[in-house]
Amino acid sequence: MGYISTIKTAVQLFPFLAFLLTLPYMILNYRKYGSVNKLRVLIFYSFILYLMTVYLLVILPLPDPSKIHTSYSEMVNLQPFAFVVDFFKKSPFDLAQTGTWIQALKHPTFYVPAFNVLMLIPFGMYLRYYFKCGFKKTILLTALFSLFLELTQLSGLYFMYPGPYRLADVDDIIQNTTGCGVGYLLGWFLVWLLPTRDEIDEHSFRVGTRVSGFRMGLAFLIDFVMLSLLYAVIERLETIPYVAVLAVYFALIPLWRGKTLGMALLKFRLHFDKQKWLRTIWRGILVVGYFYLIPQGLFYLISLLNSDLTDNSLLTLSMILLLFFALLLYLILTLAIVLLNRRFPFDRLAGAEYESTVRVKKELLKDETESSK
């Protein structure tokens, strides 16, 4: 498997890893900043794709274990700069003959070390730009990362193979670290071109002072998932209507500090100008009606009418279509509220507002207050 094939494999596997990381990543961002910054998302996922590509380049292709008969001692090189000696000994390079220069560039003794240098250049750029590492820290982290890759090879993919199937080479660490140093120097371009990490953080905090529709929607999703898991356990102990569990959860739990578990996880809470207890309970009942009773009622009516449907029941078919469009309208409305940062109908009826509980610097809060006036 060549370099291009390995990179294609990384690109194909990336969506699955991205899917697994999305929910935890969003929760961490909401907890830390109160918002999910688009540029930060782009940087994060590109960094994950890059790391996955590097890792796969190190371990692929995976050989047949029955064909591995190597020992650990013969698959390790601890002599530094052996690649320089190999280049002058094995490549066709001759300083006096310019015609050999291009041939030397195509020889493995040149392009393999060159690729090792190039492979870690982006790592240095990421460390300088986004992670704000100094030069010494960048070099140290790169050396450790490269050492991890070499130990992965030396261990035969963490002893899954009877022996190493690739050479663990100290020269690889030298080349990788050199590449990262070059990447660190090139990182000034990203610092000049893109907003700084501090500017990204500041913008995230500013946006996070207001609870977005997506943040609310994610909190509701977390609440309903946790309640469904909880109900699966409670139902075995005692028969309790699911709607009753929902009503107790959304109407009574927020009476304590104005939060459900989903809200607490994403760091925001309910706020009422007056009649907090009464409005909280009223809102909880409306939440159950909106997210459970309305869709369940529509599904029930559609199922009921469908069971009585005959070839000549045009009226019944029309009613089913009408209910289906009502359900579709409900879904579109809910999605629009989340994406357009609008308030849910139950929040409007109950007079509920949301407050972010993410800690923000006083200077940012002051600027945000002045800009909203």
PLM regions with names:
Residues 1-164, 181-266, 272-373:
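Bulky hydrophobic segments
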